[in-house]
UniProtKB/Swiss-Prot annotation:
The beta and gamma chains are produced by partial proteolytic processing of the lectin alpha chain by an asparaginyl endopeptidase. Mixture of 60% alpha lectin and 40% of its beta and gamma proteolytic fragments. One of its GO terms (molecular function) is carbohydrate binding. The keyword Manganese applies. This is Lectin alpha chain. PROSITE patterns: LECTIN_LEGUME_BETA (PS00307). Homotetramer. It comes from the Eukaryota. InterPro entries: ConA-like_dom_sf (IPR013320), Lectin_legB_Mn/Ca_BS (IPR019825), Leguminous_Lectin_Domain_sf (IPR053761). Keywords: Calcium, Lectin, Manganese, Mannose-binding. Seed. Belongs to the leguminous lectin family.
């Protein structure tokens, strides 16, 4: 499979380039340039699995 997926944990809003104005996880399919954004909590206790 030649699918390339990038995942980014982003807490800085780059609104000038289309980033959401909230902490988020970006998931990008680099071959088709489709992006999805998902909110996340910045509370470390919420990150414990």
């Amino acid at each position: 499979a030649d699918t390339i997926v990038a995942v980014e944990l982003d807490s800085y809003p780059n609104t000038d380039i289309g980033d959401p104005n909230y902490p988020h996880i970006s998931i990008a399919d680099e071959n088709s340039l489709h992006f999805s954004f998902h909110k996340f909590s910045q509370n470390p206790k919420d990150l414990i699995l």
